[in-house]
């Protein structure tokens, strides 16, 4: 059986960023907590169209058929009604080496409002080179304004046993 997988702490995260092993753009050291990195909500979203017919869940499902892409300028917001979901994306572009994976976690201050930042896709594969799409759902009781540039979630980094690189269709995603 292999060794353990360790969560990277602040000092280790900063060391690896300074060495160029992990890249986050844009980046400021104030984003790094004891064992996570704050990521910010970008300006681009996908909102779901009001559709009355069922949509087939398949490997090649085309979100363009049921969503529309919108851009929210800085200083503006997207209102997310209770029970509704949208796709957002991080401001930060993240590049991980083949021996580091990650996890996205919502922030507790927003969870208390009923805001879910990722529906089920919180795992970030080693070797990714992209911005992270967020499956954002308002499970609360009141409409919530999604404001670009807010520190919306945290990235937790973990060292992998061995090396691997994700090469799937979302490896270099730039839009939700």
Question: How would you label these PLM feature ranges?
Answer:
Residues 1-176:
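DUTPase catalytic domain/fold
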């Amino acid at each position: 059986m292999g060794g353990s997988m360790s969560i990277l702490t602040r000092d280790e995260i900063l060391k690896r960023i300074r060495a160029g092993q992990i890249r986050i753009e844009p980046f400021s050291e104030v984003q790094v907590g004891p064992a996570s990195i704050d990521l910010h909500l970008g300006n681009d979203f996908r909102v779901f169209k009001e559709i009355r017919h069922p949509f087939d869940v398949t490997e090649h499902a085309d979100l363009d058929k049921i969503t529309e892409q919108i851009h929210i300028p800085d200083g503006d917001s997207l209102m997310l009604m209770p029970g509704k979901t949208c796709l957002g994306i991080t401001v930060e572009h993240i590049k991980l080496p083949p021996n580091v994976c990650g996890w996205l976690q919502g922030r507790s201050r927003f969870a208390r409002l009923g805001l879910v930042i990722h529906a089920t896709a919180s795992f970030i594969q080693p070797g990714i080179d992209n911005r992270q799409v967020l499956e954002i759902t308002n499970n609360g009781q009141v409409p919530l304004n999604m404001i670009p540039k807010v520190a919306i979630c945290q990235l937790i980094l973990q060292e992998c046993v061995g090396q691997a690189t994700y090469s799937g269709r979302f490896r270099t995603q730039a839009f939700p």
